[in-house]
Amino acid sequence: MKLRASVLIGATILCLILSACSNYAKKVVKQKNHVYTPVYNELIEKYSEIPLNDKLKDTPFMVQVKLPNYKDYLLDNKQVVLTFKLVHHSKKITLIGDANKILQYKNYFQANGARSDIDFYLQPTLNQKGVVMIASNYNDNPNSKEKPQTFDVLQGSQPMLGANTKNLHGYDVSGANNKQVINEVAREKAQLEKINQYYKTLLQDKEQEYTTRKNNQREILETLSNRAGYQMRQNVISSEIFKNGNLNMQAKEEEVREKLQEERENEYLRNQIRSLLSGK
């Protein structure tokens, strides 16, 4: 009886083991460019594009936020989702700040799922470390009846609604015509124009200075050349004078020699005459 019970228990355990082995887990698939093993393929869904939020896509808004300016990265983890949600639902993005930084943000947004039909406008400025982003999804037509709403995106708080609300950077964005933002951008453009004019004037001054230096160098070379020619002429004249002096000296020496020779000849004749007169 005990033996039969033991056999029955063993058979039951064997059946359970075989049943468990027959329902083995499905093999997981390792995706490319990943060092970890993901979940089963049944749980992986791929989308051709990120869907829009029904409320945000139908709500006109203009949002201005001051994006961070970290050295090694752009956004904190807690800021990424909300910022991309804002960017993805916008029709127009204006980035104001350092030229390299705003270009990094633009490329970052476009490379990480932002809609391809978003219009990006870059406004580079000097002496501004951070980046200001103005995002809107409403019609820019001043006759439009759409009124934008303001959201404190990076803080993740509730929408700040109302006629006199202000966003993070202190601008009133409750109306479709954001005069303060427009004036700020206009001031930035005027500043850039002044800077461009300054560098243009500086370049013209440098070109004028270079031209003046070249002219001075040419005048100096001409002066040195004239002096060298004058010195050469003086040397030639001096050489001619020296040569003429030598010739005159030689002529005088020759004249002296001739006179001496004539004196010797005269003395010789006088001696001959004296000898004849004395009868010797």
UniProtKB/Swiss-Prot annotation:
- Record's subcellular location: Cell membrane
The stretch of residues making up the signal peptide is: 1-20
Query: What mutagenesis or variant effect is reported for S144N?
Result: In strain: NCTC 11638
| Alphabetized Pfam families for the sequence | Cag12
* Coiled-coil residues: none
Q: Keywords assigned by UniProt?
A: Cell membrane, Lipoprotein, Membrane, Palmitate, Signal
What is the recorded name of this protein? CAG pathogenicity island protein 12
Q: Which organism is it from?
A: Helicobacter pylori (strain ATCC 700392 / 26695) (Campylobacter pylori)
Name the encoding gene, please.
cagT
